[in-house]
Design a protein with these regions (language model features):
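Short, well-ordered coil/turn residues that connect adjacent beta-strands
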Residues: 120, 153-154
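Well-ordered beta-strand positions in beta-sheet-rich domains
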Residues: 147-151
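Glycine-rich loop(s) and the adjacent beta-strand/alpha-helix scaffold that form part
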Residues: 154-196
């Protein structure tokens, strides 16, 4: 997980916390996001994201993400990316890296408690379907080459972006569409491929 391309993200995360008392709100964040997406985004998804944006920042702080702070100790934010108010929470010039490390730290704590089993150096080969529902995956152990199956009640593919499906991309070479394609081949729905 520490090799994800998210490590390159620098800007920050927009959230309607209204720390600067400049009139920010869920509706204002919603409108800025829709407008910034050239009115092509799904409005119900954007509205839901605007609603939970405050909680996302709080969750990241709880995971240990060191967001920039003002001298008084409150989280600092700035105007970034054409928004109308200061709502971008950031970790200096390395927001993506700090978010990734925070998420990985939270995952590590769950692994220590034996609540999560981690399979490093495994490549997903296929999705296992039972009565039309994803109930596991087939993987190849990249160390010894053995093929293994892993059953689950729910399958979540957290594969990251797939920008290398295009000819030109600044993303790492591992950011390809392979896992998405394998799931789509088994019947998973696929939408908005241009928004990677």
């Amino acid at each position: 997980p520490r090799r994800a391309h998210s490590i390159a993200a620098q800007g920050g995360i927009n959230a309607a916390k209204n720390y600067k008392s400049d009139g920010d709100s869920v509706m204002r964040l919603f409108y800025d996001t829709i407008k910034g997406g050239d009115f092509r985004s799904r409005e119900d998804n954007v509205y839901r994201l605007a609603e939970i944006s405050k909680n996302i920042i709080d969750q990241c702080v709880a995971q240990g993400v060191p967001f920039a702070r003002e001298y008084g100790g409150l989280l600092d934010n700035r105007s970034f990316g054409g928004v109308q108010v200061s709502r971008t929470f950031y970790a200096r010039g390395q927001t993506g890296q700090q978010l990734l490390l925070g998420a990985y730290s939270a995952l590590s704590r769950q692994m220590e408690k034996k609540k999560v089993v981690f399979y490093p150096r495994h490549d997903m080969l296929d999705v296992v379907l039972v009565e039309g529902k994803a109930k596991g995956i087939v993987t190849r152990n990249l160390v010894d080459g053995k093929v293994e199956t892993h059953s689950a009640d729910i399958v979540i593919l957290a594969t990251g972006g797939y920008s290398n499906v295009y000819y030109l991309s600044t993303n790492a070479m591992a950011s390809n569409v392979t896992a998405n394609w394998r799931a789509h081949r088994k019947g998973a729905l696929f939408a908005n491929p241009s928004f990677t």
